Regions:
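Amphipathic alpha-helical segments
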Residues: 4-22
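Acidic, low-complexity, intrinsically disordered interaction modules
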Residues: 20-73
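Short active-site oxyanion
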Residues: 1
Length: 85
């Protein structure tokens, strides 16, 4: 699992194509919309939560095997904004 490093300002994500998608009950969310088709279902992009967790936008679709997220966040890895847990 990947997370943003401590102290990273979420607004920096705009530089990498992420858009603020609102504050839901669980905090601010930033989304980079890209088509990620797995078993005929579109995961709709990469979502970063206020506490730094990085996941696919729809991480709980049943009966599919999720791909490794690493290839989809290479820009953040190269910019040294994330850590692997």
């Amino acid at each position: 699992m990947y997370k943003l490093k401590e102290g990273i300002r979420l607004r920096q994500l705009q530089d990498f194509g992420y858009k603020y998608v609102g504050n839901y009950n669980r905090g601010d969310q930033w989304l980079k919309e890209i088509d990620i088709i797995v078993d005929g279902k579109n995961l709709c992009g990469i979502l970063i939560q206020e506490w730094g967790e990085i996941s696919f936008r729809f991480p709980f679709i049943k009966n599919i095997k999720y791909p490794n997220i690493e290839p989809y966040i290479q820009d953040l890895i190269k910019a040294d904004l994330v850590v692997k847990e």
